[in-house]
């Protein structure tokens, strides 16, 4: 029996459930699979396998399902720390999130923290599921909780007034009880997710960028750089910029090779070698990027959200303070940077997540949402994401 090819006719979107512990994220995930995918019971999702992303162990459950319009990959994490790590490392990229809030409790500390993280790591859109509505008899109380959630979203720069909020009960949906707050609510939620969470631009449609991994000299032909195309398409004869570490320069791609074969173009996901016109072997190095002119710029100072590994995760054994100088691993190379902690934060303990300012000793091609590892002598001690560029 031939293996069936994965039919991708529908647009693909990555989403996940976020929210406070015990508000019903996993029950809702199970309920969605019940109506839109291959049913996964609560226990199957809750026993999430451990994965390693950028040297950090994270427990994440992955399920997939589809609506009439889209195919979804959905992540759900068992513990709060897993969410923090997941969102900061981007182990599971989220194009949108379903925020689950218990109507009985209203927003709680982790509700706030997950919304803040979603803002910091650039999750584009949030849809809310107000869960456990069968535990609240007073409709005015429900309206109050909804208002609180909207205010909290607005506080962190999400459009609180416009965010869709669906009221229901994941448990009722799982147990085939009260259809109006069970199955109907889950179906309504997914139709809101379909409409409200934007379809991400495919990597191949974005401006060309390729991090340089290696540089070779080929006698009689010139300099070849190799790497995996992160996004966009590069065609032979196109002009590109070389960005980062040194002053930005321009060159023309005179050849593209893959698996030793000559191509007329390379695209997102391809591992290619690019032959560059008039570039000296000494004039280019690992850690720089090739990019469409004007699409990305080099920077040294930025604000970041970072997670610092615990000792058990192989991280530091001691806290660090302002002026900490580790290496920041961007794409393919380490660059030393100096950390400034926010006012009122005396020190950062292993296991914390923190907003910090970083100043690199050389510029790197950078944009918001770019992820990095924090390393000391080649050992990963943290992970982060650029939340804002300063200069």
Curated annotation (Swiss-Prot):
Binding site for GTP: 19-26, 76-80, 131-134
Region of interest (G4), ranges: 131-134
EC number(s) given by UniProt: 3.6.5.3
Keywords noted in UniProt: Cytoplasm, Elongation factor, GTP-binding, Hydrolase, Magnesium, Metal-binding, Nucleotide-binding, Protein biosynthesis
Main enzyme class: hydrolase
Residues holding Mg(2+): 26
Pfam families associated with the record: GTP_EFTU, GTP_EFTU_D2, GTP_EFTU_D3
The keyword Nucleotide-binding is annotated on this UniProt entry: yes
Region: G2, residue numbers: 55-59
An annotated Gene Ontology molecular function: translation elongation factor activity
Compartment annotation: Cytoplasm
Location of the region described as G3 in the Swiss-Prot/TrEMBL record: 76-79
Main location: cytoplasm
Function: GTP hydrolase that promotes the GTP-dependent binding of aminoacyl-tRNA to the A-site of ribosomes during protein biosynthesis.
NCBIfam families in UniProt: EF-Tu, PRK00049.1, PRK12735.1, PRK12736.1, small_GTP
Similarity remark: Belongs to the TRAFAC class translation factor GTPase superfamily. Classic translation factor GTPase family. EF-Tu/EF-1A subfamily.
Entry protein name: Elongation factor Tu
Organism encoding this protein: Bartonella tribocorum (strain CIP 105476 / IBS 506)
């Amino acid at each position: 029996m031939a293996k069936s090819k994965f039919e991708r006719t529908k647009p693909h979107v990555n989403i996940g459930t976020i929210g406070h512990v015990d508000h019903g994220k996993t029950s809702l995930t199970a309920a969605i699979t019940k109506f839109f995918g291959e049913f996964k019971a609560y226990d199957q999702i809750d026993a999430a396998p451990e994965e390693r992303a950028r040297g950090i162990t994270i427990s994440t459950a992955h399920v997939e399902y589809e609506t009439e319009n889209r195919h979804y990959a959905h992540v759900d994490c068992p513990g709060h720390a897993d969410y923090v790590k997941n969102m900061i490392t981007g182990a599971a990229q989220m194009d949108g999130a379903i925020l689950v809030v218990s109507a009985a409790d209203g927003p709680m500390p982790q509700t706030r923290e997950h919304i803040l993280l979603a803002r910091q790591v650039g999750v584009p859109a949030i849809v809310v599921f107000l869960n456990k509505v069968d535990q609240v008899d007073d409709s005015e109380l429900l309206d109050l909780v909804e208002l609180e959630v909207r205010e909290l979203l607005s506080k962190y720069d999400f459009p609180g007034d416009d965010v869709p909020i669906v009221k229901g009960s994941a448990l009722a949906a799982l147990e085939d009880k009260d259809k109006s707050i069970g199955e109907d609510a889950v179906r309504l939620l997914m139709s809101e997710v379909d409409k409200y969470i934007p379809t991400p631009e495919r990597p191949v449609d974005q401006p060309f960028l390729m991090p340089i991994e290696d540089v070779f000299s080929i006698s009689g032909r010139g300099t070849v750089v190799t790497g995996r195309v992160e996004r966009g398409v590069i065609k032979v004869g196109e002009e590109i910029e070389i960005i980062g570490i040194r002053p930005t320069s321009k060159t023309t791609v005179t050849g593209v090779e893959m698996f030793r074969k000559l191509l007329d173009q390379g695209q997102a996901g391809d591992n290619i070698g690019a032959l560059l016109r008039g570039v000296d072997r000494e004039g280019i190095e690992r850690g720089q990027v090739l990019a469409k002119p004007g699409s990305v710029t080099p920077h040294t100072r930025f604000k970041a959200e970072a997670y610092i590994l615990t000792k058990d995760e192989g991280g530091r054994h001691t806290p660090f303070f302002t002026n900490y100088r580790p290496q920041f691993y961007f794409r393919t190379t380490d660059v030393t940077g100096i950390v400034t902690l926010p006012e009122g934060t005396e020190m950062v303990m292993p296991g914390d997540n923190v907003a910090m300012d970083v100043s690199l000793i050389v510029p790197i091609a950078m944009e918001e949402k770019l992820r990095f590892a924090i390393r000391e002598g080649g050992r990963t001690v943290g992970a982060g994401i650029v939340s804002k560029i300063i200069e």
